Amino acid sequence: MINVLAVAGLPGSGKTTVARIIERRGYLYYSLGDVVRAEAERRGLTPDKTAVTMRLERGRKAVIYELLKSVKPGEKVVIDGIRSIEEVEALEEFLGTVFLIYVVASRKVRYQRLTGRGRSDDPLSFSQFLLRDLRELRFGLADLLSRADYIIVNETKSIEELEQEIGKVLLELR
């Protein structure tokens, strides 16, 4: 059985929704975005600047190393917001085999989701949205698509449809 599930995808793709469904199936939930937002608050910076700064200061694995301080080997965990192959490798190094789920949705759908979410780090304009996508892709997010063990196309799926799909995936992992 695989105990470590990682969820990746561009902002607004539905990563957190997928990860929270997995959490309800008995996995402990951890968010790399929460790590960045907490560090941003501590530093007095925006989450976007903090994500870049952490990686510039301590390398591409900086955020995952911070998160790993809270995770115990052997726990069933879902990690929300993986950004690079290096982060997956760090998880594998400390926790064992990782099953990577990549969530995709169109630019239009993702922008609509983000502007309706109400989080402080959501884009205020379409140009900000595009810049955020570029930043995320520079972290190595696109490279994860070829490493994905499972891809969810989350364009128009209801929560119930996502729950059914994820349930089937988790059954196969047993």
UniProtKB/Swiss-Prot annotation:
Disulfide bonds: none annotated. ATP binds at G9, L10, P11, G12, S13, G14, K15, T16. The keyword Repressor does not apply. Keywords: ATP-binding, Nucleotide-binding. Pfam families: AAA_17. One of its GO terms (molecular function) is ATP binding. Coiled coil: none annotated. The keyword ATP-binding applies. Belongs to the UPF0200 family. This is UPF0200 protein PAE1629.
